[in-house]
């Protein structure tokens, strides 16, 4: 009831500032309840929300303001990271001054502990800056506005892109139908039960399974502003499960690798009662087999890997545990979801035999809940997704479907490297490196080679407690040789795997995806842009000296 009152009040505050059906509202908030309230307040009015990950740089925020053309921006004083506080108001003010599109109003939720006050930014960017709490208190609560099933609910900009951002459009009707179905049949969560999705509302996972999915199912959703490690330790997820009686938990593989690195023996898990937990899900990037086996061993239950994209809004391939759980195959996202006609094609668009790697595509039409277009750019939608293989949606991922119909996603198509004419998936090479007991996580890229075209180059992060050998020492030479032998054993000499180095950390987006393309561009001496979604640019800077391996 309190949530409903807050949403009605928030919708009333927006309506009082001229926001109505079809108008856009940009939401720039961290993982706090006000983000959830803001999104649902927009939906109540038929307005289109566009959530931007809290902490994005002003330039990137400005580009999204120009594309979405919002009337109102909803933000707060700042966000809290494990080692710092991020001031939001100066970033919003700079973005408004940079953007060509004029924003009428900025509503600000006050949080204690931040330096910038509302008065410090008042009037900047030509906008009216107002206190959110005061605006809600003074507003008349708003009723729901009817919308068509095909009216847009939100626009969400994809991460890791350069140039003009791609605004994925989600419609109302298909989205609601798909999420309601998946909550019951994929995640096995119903009324009164709790689901915890350790993501962010700035990403599609947060939209679908922190905000809308649990609401449509009548379930409890757990919002968590912290991190898998460091807030306060690597037992944070286990504490959430115990404290809130979580039935289904959903996170990204990068979080699991971070926990494994900090607590490789899983000692912190032992202090918590996880008896409520029935299912543990992973998605967002490839779940390497070594990490999957590790977490399964700790939990004593299968880890359900599944695969989807910002564009699809829900799982392309999944294990329907709410219907009947299928046997789990390590490294597989299970089987195509109902309504998804998944095929694997060669470069000419012809289907390949079972067990053969190729381009993963979806035969049209796409199922409910997937993107109908890109915001104000139908032609870019056609060019980006529908042109490579006519009659199909091109996922941009490569993979294999085995004889049992299980899908194995091996990586983005630009993550396939060509060594002397042999196409090798970086995912396969990374799985071999990750099998070494000292490795917490790793990345492999293809670097230019004058003789072979490309050579694989590996970068590994060691587990917590494993000593990092001195450069040039016998210990380092022994470790690197073991890593080379692991690849030779699992992949074969065809990989010609020689270049491998130990690093402190890998560069990632805030959603946990490793920036392999940027690493490859740096290694090859190409021009590159640091993606706006990068979690810590200092990690990339630290790698600059090691990304070009010796020839």
Positions of predicted regions on the chain:
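Conserved AMP-binding/adenylate-forming
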Residues: 13-62, 194-201
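Conserved AMP-binding/adenylation subdomain of ANL enzymes
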Residues: 176-194, 204-247, 261-263, 267
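Gly/Ser/Thr-rich phosphate-binding loop
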Residues: 219, 247-250, 260-327, 341, ...
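Conserved ATP/PPi-binding loop(s) of AMP-dependent carboxylate-activating enzymes
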Residues: 335-339, 350-385, 424, 527-528
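Flexible lysine-rich "adenylation lid" loop at the C-terminal edge of ANL adenylation domains
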Residues: 348-349, 451, 497, 503-523
């Amino acid at each position: 009831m309190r949530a409903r009152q807050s949403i009605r009040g928030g919708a009333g505050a927006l309506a009082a500032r001229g926001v109505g059906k079809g108008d856009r509202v940009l939401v720039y908030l961290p993982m706090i309840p006000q983000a959830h309230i803001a999104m649902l307040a927009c939906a109540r009015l038929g307005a289109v929300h566009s959530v931007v990950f809290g902490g994005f740089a002003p330039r990137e925020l400005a580009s999204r303001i120009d594309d979405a053309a919002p009337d109102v921006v909803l933000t707060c004083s700042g966000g809290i990271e494990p080692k710092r506080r991020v001031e939001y108001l100066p970033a919003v003010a700079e973005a408004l001054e940079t953007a060509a599109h004029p924003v009428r109003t900025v509503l600000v939720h006050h949080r204690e502990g931040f330096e910038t006050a509302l008065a410090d930014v008042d009037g900047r960017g030509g906008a009216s800056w107002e206190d959110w709490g005061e605006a809600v208190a003074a507003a008349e609560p708003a009723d729901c506005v009817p919308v068509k099933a095909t009216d847009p609910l939100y626009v969400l900009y994809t991460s890791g892109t350069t140039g003009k951002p791609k605004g994925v459009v989600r419609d109302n009707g298909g989205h609601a139908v798909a999420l309601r179905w998946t909550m019951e049949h994929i995640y096995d969560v119903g009324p009164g039960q709790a689901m915890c999705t350790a993501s962010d509302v700035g990403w599609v996972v947060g939209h679908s399974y922190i905000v809308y999915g649990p609401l449509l199912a009548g379930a409890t959703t757990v919002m968590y502003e912290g991190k898998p490690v460091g807030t306060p330790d690597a037992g944070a997820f286990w504490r959430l499960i115990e404290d809130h009686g979580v039935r289904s938990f959903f996170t990204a593989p990068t979080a699991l690798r971070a926990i494994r690195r900090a607590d490789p023996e899983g000692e912190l898990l032992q202090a918590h009662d996880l008896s409520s937990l029935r299912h543990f899900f992973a998605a967002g990037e490839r779940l390497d087999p070594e990490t999957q086996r590790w977490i399964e061993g700790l939990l004593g239950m299968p880890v359900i890997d599944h695969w989807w994209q910002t564009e699809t809004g829900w799982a392309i391939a999944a294990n329907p545990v709410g219907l009947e759980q299928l046997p789990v195959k390590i490294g597989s996202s299970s089987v195509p979801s109902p309504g998804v006609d998944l095929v694997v094609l060669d470069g000419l668009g012809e289907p390949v035999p079972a067990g053969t790697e190729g381009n993963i595509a979806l035969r049209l039409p796409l199922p409910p809940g997937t993107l109908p277009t890109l915001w104000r750019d139908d032609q870019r939608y056609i060019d980006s997704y529908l042109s490579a293989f006519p009659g199909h949606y091109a996922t941009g991922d490569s993979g294999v479907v085995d004889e049992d119909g299980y899908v194995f996603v091996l990586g983005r198509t630009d993550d396939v490297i060509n060594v002397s004419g042999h196409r090798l998936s970086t995912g396969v090479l990374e799985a071999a490196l990750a099998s070494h007991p000292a490795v917490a996580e790793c990345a492999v890229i293809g670097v230019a080679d004058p003789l072979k075209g490309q050579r694989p180059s590996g970068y590994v992060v060691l587990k917590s407690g494993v000593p990092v050998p001195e450069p040039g020492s016998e210990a380092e030479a022994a470790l690197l040789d073991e890593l080379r032998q692991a690849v030779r054993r699992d992949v074969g000499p065809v990989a010609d795997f020689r270049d491998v180095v130990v690093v402190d950390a890998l560069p990632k987006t805030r959603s946990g995806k490793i920036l392999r393309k940027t690493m490859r561009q740096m290694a090859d001496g190409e021009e590159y842009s640091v993606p706006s979604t990068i979690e810590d640019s200092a990690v990339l800077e630290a790698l600059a000296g090691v990304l070009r391996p010796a020839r």
